[in-house]
């Protein structure tokens, strides 16, 4: 059974994350109050492509490998989500199923907020919308940079 409490190191990783630490104390409190802990061993499946968006997730320890599997069966790693990073919010907004597989990389602890709690937090903390928009903007800028590099760097 999962230990329902974050360790001191895991809590510090969440609290010191660039995005999360920028939120108001009351919003951070409400997010953490609703969250629950899940622990995984190296290589465990956390979420599969096609899964419903049941949770908003933060990595607290280890890493989450986000990947896609080609028709040929080749698995392509898209990114590693490190401690302090939140993810899965896009599916929470649009309600579509998960678009990629996610696996634990090393012993991994994640913090999860159920979809219903996510919606309640959004309703009581309008600032979360703006904060998530800033997070998405940062992700889009990073993506544009990667696309630019792919198109301009020599092979």
Which residues are covered by each model-predicted region?
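Cytosolic regulatory regions built on CNB/CRP/Popeye-like sensor folds
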Residues: 1-155
